[in-house]
């Protein structure tokens, strides 16, 4: 399993970004339609189901981290490692589904948990199998499969159900679950050929029980870190849902979703570079991570300024006056979102490449505690704006702490992490910009 070169990474990043952009565009269109059809309360139910389903993603993150570490750092057989990972995924899916069904327990006010429970095992498998595509350098293939199902394809299906069929919320949610089922089934095709032959003996991973035990030990810490990260990222949503009206939850989640549109670039870079960071030597992986972090934050600053200026106006004109309060909330969220866009890259290096999932777990626990305490302290007197301020404070703190630990673990100077460099611009684009500037100077003379 070889890492792609710089041109290959750029190609994969652009491909990932294009598919994410397609998915985001379709998701925004579907979101507008569902918000207008079902109002803030219905929008809140749909958003909350998606947020609850993220627990499947965090569980899969632990499995993915363990697989990437065993294949990338320990050089184990990919086939043997994945075979053990499937057993771990089955156990996690069973536990997660049962837990969500127990929380729902037939309560009509908790239907979000029912829909999330139905999609949970398929989502977990889909997220976990993504690491096979990353390590086997088949990112474009899984991008297309995801875009056609849980990405743009699923959103377009929801859009059609709402605008053409005028389907009720329950039918829309069933269709939402069905897209995860389809995506999980489709993603399994071709994996056997990608994995290659299985190895034998300790050098290739050892007995399945030994591989599984090591995965459980490593993956449990990585999954716990990912879960705590998610809770730190979304504890404000749970508190808003518990303390304020459903309509307020719908407004708040819309502000969050609007801000997270900026994360398309960072998600594309993280997804396409994960296999490379896992398999490169430590120094090269650290240099790549630092370059991506400083480049992403620089891009997000520009995007954040534009979204702060246009976001509130777009929300009112696209979603309706009932969601106008989301505009000021969005502006309060943006500073933290700009910095938090690099969190995934920093966390991946600390947990997977440096092999310190326990350290990451500790950092995320601190972030969760800070965000929860600040949200509880501010939501009473300031409402949604208090929750947004608490969220931003937690994001900024998390970024500063993780940058510090990344610098220590990798030996990278802070300047190389924080300050963009001319070399960060792709060579072809840099040469074109240089030629354009020279042409302008010549014309002025």
Model features per residue range: what roles?
Residues 11-27, 48-107, 111, 276, ...:
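Membrane-water interface segments that mark the loop-to-transmembrane alpha-helix transition
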């Amino acid at each position: 399993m070889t890492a792609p070169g710089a041109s290959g990474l750029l190609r994969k990043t652009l491909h990932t970004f294009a598919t994410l952009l397609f998915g985001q565009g379709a998701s925004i269109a579907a979101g507008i339609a569902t918000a207008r059809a079902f109002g803030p309360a219905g929008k809140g139910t749909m958003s909350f189901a998606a947020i609850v389903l993220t627990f499947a993603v965090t569980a899969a993150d632990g499995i993915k981290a363990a697989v990437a570490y065993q294949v990338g750092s320990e050089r184990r057989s990919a086939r043997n490692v994945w075979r053990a990972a499937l057993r771990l995924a089955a156990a996690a899916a069973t536990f997660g589904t049962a837990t969500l069904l127990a929380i729902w327990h037939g309560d009509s006010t908790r239907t979000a948990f029912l829909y999330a429970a139905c999609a949970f095992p398929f989502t977990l498998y889909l997220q976990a199998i993504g690491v096979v595509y990353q390590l086997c350098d088949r990112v474009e293939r899984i991008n297309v499969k995801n875009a056609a199902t849980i990405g743009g394809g699923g959103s377009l299906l929801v859009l059609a159900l709402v605008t053409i069929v005028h389907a009720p919320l329950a039918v829309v949610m069933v269709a939402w679950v069905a897209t995860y089922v389809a995506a999980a089934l489709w993603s399994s095709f071709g994996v056997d050929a990608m994995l290659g032959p299985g190895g034998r003996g300790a050098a290739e991973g050892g007995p399945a029980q030994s591989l599984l035990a090591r995965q459980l030990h490593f993956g449990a810490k990585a999954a716990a870190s990912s879960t705590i990260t998610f809770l730190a990222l979304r504890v404000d949503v749970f508190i808003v849902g518990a303390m304020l009206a459903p309509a307020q939850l719908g407004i708040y989640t819309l502000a969050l979703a609007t801000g997270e549109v900026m994360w398309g670039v960072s998600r594309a870079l993280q997804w396409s570079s994960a296999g490379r960071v896992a398999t490169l030597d430590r120094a090269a992986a650290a240099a790549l991570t630092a370059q991506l972090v400083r480049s992403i934050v620089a891009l997000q600053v520009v995007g954040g300024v534009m979204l702060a200026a246009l976001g509130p106006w777009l929300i009112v004109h696209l979603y309706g006056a009932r969601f106008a309060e989301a505009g000021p909330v969005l502006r309060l969220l943006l500073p933290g979102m700009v910095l938090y866009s690099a969190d995934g890259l920093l966390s991946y290096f600390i947990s997977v490449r440096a092999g310190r999932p326990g350290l990451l777990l500790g950092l995320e626990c601190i972030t969760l505690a800070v965000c929860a305490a600040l949200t509880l302290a501010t939501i009473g007197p300031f409402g949604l704006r208090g929750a947004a301020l608490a969220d931003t404070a937690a994001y900024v703190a998390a970024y500063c702490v993780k940058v510090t630990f990344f610098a220590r673990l990798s030996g990278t100077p802070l300047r190389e992490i924080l300050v963009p460099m001319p070399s960060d611009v792709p060579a072809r684009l840099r040469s074109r910009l240089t030629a354009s500037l020279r042409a302008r100077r010549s014309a002025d003379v």
